[in-house]
């Protein structure tokens, strides 16, 4: 999937909200619905609603979106593997962004997002040996995006060269228990470039390349050692991973993968 440096469209909120500043129309709205993995299951769905309003080059553009993901029916089991209830997990997010042109060819955007995840659908039953109860989790996150788009005149029409950059889901962690286990949200960095070549008034060809980097630290293996060279237990690994702050995790993700050579 790519979209951080492609042409602006109504779905730019997901890929790069800074692209909305280059939309030609005053505003717009779009709705998408995708049945997920229909050849395997029939009750997993993804819904997405997005829109924007351009207040002018000086005032900027506001945009927002709502996404909802239903995971269908899931059989819950306790720590012994015994099934006790069926749940319908779901996750949703709502966000609001503001973008503005910094230059004729450059725009920037900032987005704020509220994320909510309910993996056990409100079933607060003991699922571990220590009788830890699961609860819905939520957190806040932000995106910072840039977009550069410059026309290049050719005999057959204007071509467009574009660069896109988006740091997304920069925010806190989520806990499904009473806070003992902190889970990272999928922070991500996108960087892309595209070139659109016109053939005539009705036909154009775009070339685009995009790189993605997940900004989530790697969970160490069960053979990890502490500073004294002693093997860490499973509980110690869990506590160590939960203790990593979000900003530290973003930076650590660049060098903590297995096989990395410093």
Regions found by a protein language model. Give the residues of each.
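Subset of outer-membrane beta-barrel
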Residues: 1-262
């Amino acid at each position: 999937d790519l979209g951080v440096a492609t042409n602006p469209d109504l779905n730019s909120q997901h890929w790069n909200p800074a692209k909305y500043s280059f939309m030609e129309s005053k505003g717009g709205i779009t709705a998408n619905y995708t049945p997920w993995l229909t050849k395997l299951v029939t009750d997993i769905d993804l819904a997405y609603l997005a829109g924007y309003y351009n207040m002018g080059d000086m005032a900027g553009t506001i945009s927002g979106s709502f996404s909802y993901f239903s995971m269908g029916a899931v059989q819950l089991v306790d720590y012994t593997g015994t099934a006790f209830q069926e749940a319908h997990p779901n996750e949703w997010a709502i966000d609001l962004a503001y973008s503005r042109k910094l230059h004729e060819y450059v725009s920037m955007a900032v987005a704020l997002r509220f994320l909510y995840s309910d993996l056990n659908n409100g079933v607060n039953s003991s699922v571990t040996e220590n009788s830890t109860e699961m609860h819905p989790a939520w957190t806040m996150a932000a995106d910072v995006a840039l977009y550069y788009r410059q026309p290049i005149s050719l005999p057959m029409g204007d071509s467009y060269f574009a660069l896109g950059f988006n740091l997304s889901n920069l925010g806190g962690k989520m806990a499904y228990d009473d806070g003992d286990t902190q889970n990272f949200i999928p922070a991500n960095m996108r960087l892309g470039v595209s070139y659109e070549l016109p053939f005539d008034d009705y036909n154009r060809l775009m070339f685009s390349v995009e790189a993605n980097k997940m900004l989530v630290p790697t969970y160490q293996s069960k053979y990890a050692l502490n500073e004294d060279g002693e093997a860490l237990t499973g509980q110690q690994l869990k506590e160590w991973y939960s203790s990593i702050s979000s900003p530290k995790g973003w930076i650590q993700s660049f060098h903590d993968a297995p096989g990395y050579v410093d």
